[in-house]
Swiss-Prot record:
Its EC number is 6.1.1.19. This is Arginine--tRNA ligase. SUPFAM superfamilies: Anticodon-binding domain of a subclass of class I aminoacyl-tRNA synthetases (SSF47323), Arginyl-tRNA synthetase (ArgRS), N-terminal 'additional' domain (SSF55190), Nucleotidylyl transferase (SSF52374). Monomer. It is an enzyme of class 6 (ligase).
Amino acid sequence: MNIQALLSEKVSQALIAAGAPADCEPQVRQSAKVQFGDYQANGVMAVAKKLGMAPRQLAEQVLSHLDLNGIANKVEIAGPGFINIFLDPAFLADNVNRALQSERLGVTKPQAQTIVVDYSAPNVAKEMHVGHLRSTIIGDASVRTLEFLGHKVIRANHVGDWGTQFGMLIAYLEKQQQENAGEMALADLEGFYREAKKHYDEDEAFAERARSYVVKLQGGDEYFLQMWRKLVDITMSQNQITYDRLNVTLTRDDVMGESLYNPMLPGIVADLKAKGLAVESEGATVVFLDEYKNKEGEPMGVIIQKKDGGYLYTTTDIACAKYRYETLHADRVLYYIDSRQHQHLMQAWTIVRKAGYVPDSVPLEHHMFGMMLGKDGKPFKTRAGGTVKLADLLDEALERARRLVAEKNPDMSADELENLAKVVGIGAVKYADLSKNRTTDYVFDWDNMLAFEGNTAPYMQYAYTRVLSVFRKAGIDENAMIDAPVVIAEDREAQLAARLLQFEETLSVVAREGTPHVMCAYLYDLAGLFSGFYEHCPILSAESEETRNSRLKLALLTAKTLKLGLDTLGIETVERM
């Protein structure tokens, strides 16, 4: 259930009954401190200002109309007109029971939408590197959350699979008599790419041949298309290994590369001209946007077709947005692309809106993210200053986790240790990123991410096993106490129960904002509250069987919430560490 939504509705009704306009905002928030209750309604001040009333006077009138019977056992006015709401222990107990009776832990489903999520987007003929990590795992956490809430999610892996580089690659492969690209490892292709680029830059005849190959490829010549497909297939089969290691949900079926939109580009340029949005300028086709100014203060020109007839990324992105609305029937489109692309996307979308390709009712959202930095505060590189390959990073994560878990579990079997190392190592890399606000740069630090203290994957995974250990120690099957009542008598029980029941609110924020760090913060807080509850409220040695069973049910809901929450982040758990 969503307590915040329930209280917002109740406070809104009371505000309207007290004379507020129908569109008033109750501004119900989770309280930052225990002494302010479980929730605060902060909307009274803004409404009082509109009505020309003293805020406390309006707050008193709101309280006289506010019906929270069976929800709150105490409501008070604080400061200039805040309303503090303390949830009734009986309400908490009842909803903990309800959550345990539901596979979804009581989480309701909103009205389902079709949501396209654009993420990962590696390039063909190159290995994935750390620059692809953030888009891949943040996007996947968003996808998992939206799917859990019941939306139809279309994963769109916008692979860089088109452009002049393919003429260059095919020409060089041909030169080396390596046409059978299907037998090559991707690492070889990287070497080929470097050599091809070198030839392209230094040998004009080679460059001319490469350019002619691009024309033939774009013209649909079967030989060149076959070579191109081989390059794409090798790349994506290698990338799939990385996706599987990262425990992300992308598959080959989710590839929607740049090439998909090629057939649309001539029509889009012609249409933008016909609508008077695009004009000829110095031989190129340009859209001038009043919303963006150049250095001279004039409308900025966005090129959509070059003088030589070639198209640009902007043209592809216009076609892409149009396709996602018209063909995929998206109600909402999320782009997990780094912050440096923001202006480029905004310009493309401005053209999309002006041309009427996507209505304003369909949000196009740039869920941008910052860079991954080394401890020196500079972009994360190898010691030699090169780009860190994602496969190498995951290998190192596994190796470090192996040493860590072997040290802590000398008696564990080799197979169990290997699985634990995988869960901890990959989880640590992902969680370190997901737990930071995506809009900021973050420092990659092995020691911090593999620590068993603080807001880290190992700590959260251990917290989960610690809750489960209560049931192992007691030798209790969770089904044995399913009918036992939950009784909330202690403050720590109430605090834990209230936080457990805020799971749906947390999911809603992640779904709306694309901010998985909010889920990480929630789970970390939950683990801390359980720790305090465990220390101060004896479970197995409780004074009565009723109290024992009630506390076991709180522990059970904690375990289930931690596991499900981590699952929405793509973080695996184990039952023993």
